[in-house]
């Protein structure tokens, strides 16, 4: 055998060997390269055991850090962990399993920390049986994932040499499953997200069919104001609320998979593993959204408010049992219908509601979500309430369009954690208003990779995989600008439909965020998100948020040698990064109505508490009194009375301060304590006038309105001309007045009704002549333009039409024709030609050319008593639209809306050919 042939055979054998053993060293189609971990976990387990024993003791509030080390990727990882502070879970977080309350304590098994030799690193995950599972991000930005081996092996096939694996994010292989996806020969390559063009059209139709309701009425009646309605705004008028509450659900498919894998067939362990799964996903999503500047909107944050876990015990043959509310029992559903199952529930109490599953959807789809829009008339996305939508043949149905779904399986393989986390961030991006990245400049590809909102799932190892493109930032910023301009509402209280308008359900953040220029617990300083923010603030002593992963002291840390930062308080010298001394008498707080001036004490960067003034001093234009240095005391309480609201009277009367005296709410104008000759509680511009008038912006009419700058009580919905017109026509007093007047003057109502009917009849009669008709016996419609410009022509044309109609009546039997009628046929000009000839014409002689055989003459019976034996002849002419006309005009063609290609019979075909011959001969 020659050498070239031998080399070719060796090459073929090598290729076959590589293809056959392609996945021998890989866990699945996603992970090819990994390293095993088998560190001793006894010391970790002891820490967890000691914690469980002391959960009821006071010492359980604080837990000593736990640590372990292992070697992988030619380095040593020395991990330091401590229990989470629950900042990722809402203060009212609740868990349920199959609808029943479940006592799950996330702080008992969830941990976060850092690498001991890398202070800028971050570690988060869970610890079960002394084994850690989670993610590590080094100070240089490299990411590692640690998974239990039980996730990839059956219970009887689990390895005994190691308990965990570790792999880098850049070792996630996407080439194989993309080949499989392309091999499906789909008409549309979904590539991870199910938001195809067909699905987009269907979802858009639903989003635009929402039922509108009265926003202002529901807003006030349902107590829509948030716990702190006086939340600050920025220079663009956007409220400083950045926390989005989440409702996380796991269906029975995901529960069953985790129970058979890392759950070890233990129900309690399984539900804790699912909560850990939720935690790791939202933790990764927060890192992405908190680190993104959406055109000035920074610090978006997500908290888990409720978790629901559904088990197979709640389903029976694809349906929920009678005592279960599991919405996901249906077995064989596609991705869009699975999203509909989640959307059928009422999720108005949450910013977003997501369902995680282990269903292998067609086309490799990993997720789907409703896309938000900045348009008020388009529903869907963040904060959308549960309301009715018109779905065509299905009629009106209730939907919650603040929903999305994510699956953890793709073509039979469990998706790596980093991929599913980016998928969740991608679908939430849809909820925030971003479609898929487009055009080409937002799809850069290699070497930096595509962005989060790319239609295909990404591995997460490229620099752009965890970032939003400029296109996505623009789209999300537009939606947030509309939502955050609305007053924040408490979604747990205001859960009723408030129309298609954008509801602001974001809440104030309870945990610290590095980059919001607010000094919070756990931070050394906070000068801003970027270095430009710090420069604008005049702080050169603090490290900004964007310095994460660049080495140095780390974000929100003081620079080396700095004693303090101006972000900590006014008592820090921005030039020297040191405290102002007490002898400098640096003023840090000016005197106010209820507190005295305060200077720095040289011990802290924050300004000391100002000495309060005496209680009872009038403040806020004498509508409040000082209490412990704050202007929040009650004026009525100074006289032993209680505060109340006036609810009856004119608008300018409702803005007076009122107190309850002798069991009645009385205006301060009529109280002797606030007479015109009083010596205290004097108001500006109201000297020698009785009563106290409320400050502009104060609530009035029992919180149904507010006092404007003219000190008049303005209703919340009385902000525009339409609202004023509605109040004028449909308020209770107007309706009662009109009803009483109609009862007293019933005869006027009757006469007016008759006059109205007569006017309408005349209107219809006059306008009927301008309405076209398909009846060939009726005259053509008149020109409305001539009637409007020359009203006199309407009467003349009306008379002419009657005369023409009288002259076209065929004579009765035996009637004599008019002189000359038989000698010559009448001629009419085209303009005066009627729309159709009479069906029966007088008997006239019809000249037939010699040699031409005319059409057969239809006969009719003669009139009884008629002496004429000649039968009458019916002269038939084709009715419109077949009336002879100029072929070049529109009248020569068929009527609009009718078929042109009418099927012909054999006789019709013969007639057509004959007619065609005649035309040709003309």
UniProtKB/Swiss-Prot annotation:
Catalytic activity, EC: 3.4.24.81
Cofactor(s) this protein cannot do without: Zn(2+)
Secretion signal, residue range per the UniProt entry: 1-26
Segments forming domain Disintegrin: 511-615
Segments in the Cytoplasmic topological domain: 767-922
GO biological process assignments: cell fate specification; embryo development ending in birth or egg hatching; membrane protein ectodomain proteolysis; nematode male tail tip morphogenesis; Notch signaling pathway; positive regulation of transforming growth factor beta receptor signaling pathway; regulation of axon guidance; regulation of mesodermal cell fate specification
Peptidase M12B domain span: 242-480
A single cellular component GO annotation: plasma membrane
Name of the protein in its database record: Disintegrin and metalloproteinase domain-containing protein 10 homolog
